[in-house]
Swiss-Prot record:
Zn(2+) 2 binds at residues 161, 164, 187, 190. The lineage of its organism: Bacteria, Bacillati, Mycoplasmatota, Mollicutes, Acholeplasmatales. It is found in: Cytoplasm. This is Chaperone protein DnaJ. GO terms for biological process: chaperone cofactor-dependent protein refolding; DNA replication; protein refolding; response to heat. CXXCXGXG motif repeats lie at residues 144-151, 161-168, 187-194, 201-208. Homodimer. Its main location: cytoplasm. Its cofactor is Zn(2+). SMART domains: DnaJ (SM00271). Keywords: Chaperone, Cytoplasm, DNA replication, Metal-binding, Repeat, Stress response, Zinc, Zinc-finger. CDD domains: DnaJ, DnaJ_C, DnaJ_zf. Participates actively in the response to hyperosmotic and heat shock by preventing the aggregation of stress-denatured proteins and by disaggregating proteins, also in an autonomous, DnaK-independent fashion. Unfolded proteins bind initially to DnaJ; upon interaction with the DnaJ-bound protein, DnaK hydrolyzes its bound ATP, resulting in the formation of a stable complex. GrpE releases ADP from DnaK; ATP binding to DnaK triggers the release of the substrate protein, thus completing the reaction cycle.
Amino acid sequence: MAKRDYYDVLGISKSASQDEIKKAYRSLAKKYHPDVSKEKDAETKFKEVQEAYDVLNDSNKKAQYDRFGHAGTGQDPFGGAGGGFGGFGGFDDIISQFFGGGQTRRTRQTSNVGEDLNMRMTIDFMEAVLGTTKNVSVDITQDCGHCHGSGAESSKDVHTCSKCHGQGFINVDQRTMFGTMRSQQVCPQCQGEGQTIDNKCHVCSGAGRVKAKKTVDVKVPAGVDNEMTLRVPGYGNGGRKGAESGDLYITFRVKPHKIFKRRGSDIILDVPITFTQAALGDKIDIPTIYGEVELTIPAGIQSGTELKLKNKGTKDPRTGKTGDQHVIVNIETPKNLSSEEKKLFEQLSKLDSPRKKSGWDKFKSFFTN
């Protein structure tokens, strides 16, 4: 099967800028990452997106592709990606792919932005429907305070890489059916940094990064529900060499309530009433998420009838619209009657006999006519 055009894979035009290419890749990589997507062919699509990005994000490879198509990139026009993608890690791994792993110095520089982090938070039902504030502690990585991310013990220990001369990449010539073609690869000596280090920082052991904790008061909006995700800007991993931090994404799990249930932004409550209340009607106090309110039970109500309390639901966090509370009436049949109660029901049954007979006749008519 012929390979798809890389521009079509990313959904961009041939005149797309580097920022537009990166934005399209990031969106599609999030959508099709196997750890996130439930689509059956997510892994195949993810590899296809990764392959397209690897070519279009490299100026030399992009130029060859624009001239010669898939053959110009060293890829089989009818096969899979030449190098493959290997295994898949967690979601943090794909976030790092959004900014890292490029083949040029310009691409390497964009990797300075901190990675996004993801966490799950369990909250109570009432916290979810009314909103709350949670103090969150996040484990992050950030630039070492001693070496400021360089990985060197001092500035004197940093030297321009002798292999790539500070470019972070080297040129590699390959023979193809169209002749010798030149591509760029990350410098193996400096790993794309453009510099080498004599003495490593004693604090971070040359990594340039250290572990740390961040705390933040997260305002949970009223109306959040299971699997909803909240973005907290700037509380992901710290950026490299002064770049901005990534973001924190919190996905919620809401504990069930003893009496309340949810249907979107509406609250559902089952309320038991007696035969007497159902027949004669009544006024009863009903709990809502905002406190008790008085509810009128109309005379003659049937079991399963749903009564509405306007604007007594939770808010929709996206629109701000408030839902309603739906009260479902359940008529309880009395058990273990006293002798006096039995006599009263027998008297009621005698008074109700003509109506009961009429109803039974109507019921039988459905089968006899």
